[in-house]
C-alpha cells in the first residue's frame, strides 16, 4: 500500500468534513463530542470492531464524552485509502449516535 498522492488526498478529504491534516505528519485527525461517556464508549466500540475486521487501527484519545482520532497507515508511512475508508466508517458510526 502506498500513500495517497497530494491530488487524491485533497479530493478524498473534501468528502470528509471536519477531518484535518496533522502538522508535521502524513495523517488526518478529527475530534468527536458525544452527549456522555456511554455514547463515546459505544462509538469507540463500533469503531474498534470495524478496525479489527479491517486490521487497520486508529490512534485515539478519550476523555469523558470526547474522542480524538488520528488516522495514518504506519506500514506505508502515510495516509492511504485504508485511512479514508476507515474515516468514512467512523463518520457513519458517529452519525448513528448523534454526535454533537
Swiss-Prot record:
State its Enzyme Commission number(s): 4.2.1.96
Q: Which GO terms describe its molecular function?
A: 4-alpha-hydroxytetrahydrobiopterin dehydratase activity
One GO biological process term is: tetrahydrobiopterin biosynthetic process
Indicate yes or no for the key word Nucleotide-binding. no
Listed A to Z, the keywords are: Lyase
- Give the CDD domains listed for this entry: PCD_DCoH_subfamily_b
Q: Which reaction does it catalyse?
A: (4aS,6R)-4a-hydroxy-L-erythro-5,6,7,8-tetrahydrobiopterin = (6R)-L-erythro-6,7-dihydrobiopterin + H2O
Query: Which Pfam families does the entry link to?
Result: Pterin_4a
Record's family?
Belongs to the pterin-4-alpha-carbinolamine dehydratase family.
Q: What is this protein called?
A: Putative pterin-4-alpha-carbinolamine dehydratase 2
Species assigned in the record:
Cupriavidus pinatubonensis (strain JMP 134 / LMG 1197)
Lineage runs: Bacteria, Pseudomonadati, Pseudomonadota, Betaproteobacteria, Burkholderiales
Amino acid at each position: 500500500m502506498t500513500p495517497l498522492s497530494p491530488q487524491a488526498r485533497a479530493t478524498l478529504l473534501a468528502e470528509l468534513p471536519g477531518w484535518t491534516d496533522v502538522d508535521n505528519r502524513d495523517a488526518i485527525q478529527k475530534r468527536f463530542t458525544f452527549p456522555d461517556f456511554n455514547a463515546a464508549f459505544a462509538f469507540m466500540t463500533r469503531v474498534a470492531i470495524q478496525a479489527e475486521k479491517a486490521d487497520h487501527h486508529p490512534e485515539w484519545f478519550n476523555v469523558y464524552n470526547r474522542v480524538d482520532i488520528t488516522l495514518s497507515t504506519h506500514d506505508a508511512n502515510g495516509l492511504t485509502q485504508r485511512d479514508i475508508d476507515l474515516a468514512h466508517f467512523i463518520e457513519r458510526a458517529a452519525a448513528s449516535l448523534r454526535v454533537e
